[in-house]
């Protein structure tokens, strides 16, 4: 049996993108013949998985999972929407979400190294799925949130996971109300919970922009200041969830709606599949609003 050197393993890894242990096993099985080792990895589907690493995966699913006082929202990408509807892929997404909650991993990199109940790492599980499904798959991001027994999580998925929202409502255990607010956030896409989260820098910048707009419109200087403050309030309403008219009842704000339930929105995370990545243009927020009419 040939001696498998680290240099040979490194060369095979470079050619196939497969993991170190997979490469070492392939070389051992093929008596150190690198060409046969490549074929071995291809036959096992491992090299096939590695070759897909340079493809763009901008489709996929967002999923929300809760366990007691912990919740996670996760986005896992695929190359096509067809695969995102695949039952096996959907099960993988749920499996990864539960793994995040069980391990409390802080980064995607750390998550990939964690061990699943079956003894395999998340990285190995993803590669197996790539080989089975035939597309590049990747864990893009996740966020963990916690609450107390007196609070509620709200989870909402649009179109089965094209948009996902996780809300944390303090002071109320009404999960339906928390979900309704999550639905609102999916539709309206606010940037912040409240104006308290908006930096002075952003407010001052917007105030200056609005002032110049008013002056350019030829408004008298003596009313510009009052006009700017009015427009600034409208701007903050557009970006802050609690100040927005509630989509299910526009006669009240989100804050007022939750107050009737004894609760207060303290946090939310909103993911849209592929946002910020190169993909076809679709406005899912407008679609959510359309379904509520």
UniProtKB/Swiss-Prot annotation:
It is found in: Cytoplasm. The keyword Protein biosynthesis applies. One of its GO terms (cellular component) is cytoplasm. GO terms for molecular function: translation elongation factor activity. PROSITE patterns: EF_TS_1 (PS01126), EF_TS_2 (PS01127). Residues 80-83 are annotated as: Involved in Mg(2+) ion dislocation from EF-Tu. Keywords: Cytoplasm, Elongation factor, Protein biosynthesis. The keyword Iron-sulfur does not apply. Associates with the EF-Tu.GDP complex and induces the exchange of GDP to GTP. It remains bound to the aminoacyl-tRNA.EF-Tu.GTP complex up to the GTP hydrolysis stage on the ribosome. Belongs to the EF-Ts family. This is Elongation factor Ts. The lineage of its organism: Bacteria, Bacillati, Bacillota, Bacilli, Bacillales.
